[in-house]
């Protein structure tokens, strides 16, 4: 069984017809590469603009505001033996790292 990996990003992600898209090719390739060894869950911000790169992983969560984003972070800490990866430090991801530390988790930044 694969370990869970939660990836937190401030990247804008667009959802169209059940598929997810982003403009940053790194945000596309990193989760897809890690998906071979981990059960990846990607967290990002929702945007209505069209994006270029389709993200081909199963578990993607997008949020419209910081409160729903934080509540999902808290919910994710209930998973045992999970790893947490924060891609780039921004106000959103900095707050995520603080919450993870308060809840006894050690994120990889």
For the regions a language model picked out, list residue spans one by one.
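Alpha-helical scaffold elements within enzyme catalytic domains, especially in hydrolases
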Residues: 32-33, 76, 99
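N-terminal subdomain of nucleotide-sugar transferases
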Residues: 1-49
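Glycine-rich phosphate-binding loop signature in dinucleotide/nucleotide-binding domains
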Residues: 77-82
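Amphipathic coiled-coil/heptad-repeat helices and related helical stalk/stem segments
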Residues: 26-27, 69, 92-93
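Short, contiguous strand/loop micro-motifs
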Residues: 16-18, 60, 83-84
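A short, charged, and often flexible helix/loop element on the N-terminal side
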Residues: 47-71, 75, 86-87
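A short acidic (Asp/Glu
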Residues: 18, 53, 95-98
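An aromatic- and histidine-rich active-site surface loop
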Residues: 84-105, 109
């Amino acid at each position: 069984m694969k370990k869970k990996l939660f990836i937190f990003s401030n990247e804008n992600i667009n959802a169209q017809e059940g598929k997810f898209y982003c403009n940053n090719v790194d945000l596309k390739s990193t989760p897809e590469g890690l998906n071979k060894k981990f059960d990846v869950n990607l967290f990002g911000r929702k945007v209505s603009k069209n994006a270029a790169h389709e993200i081909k992983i199963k578990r993607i969560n997008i949020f419209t505001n910081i409160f729903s984003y934080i509540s999902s972070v808290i919910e994710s800490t209930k998973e045992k033996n999970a790893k947490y990866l924060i891609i780039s430090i921004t106000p959103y991801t900095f707050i995520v790292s603080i919450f993870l530390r308060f809840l006894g988790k050690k994120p990889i930044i």
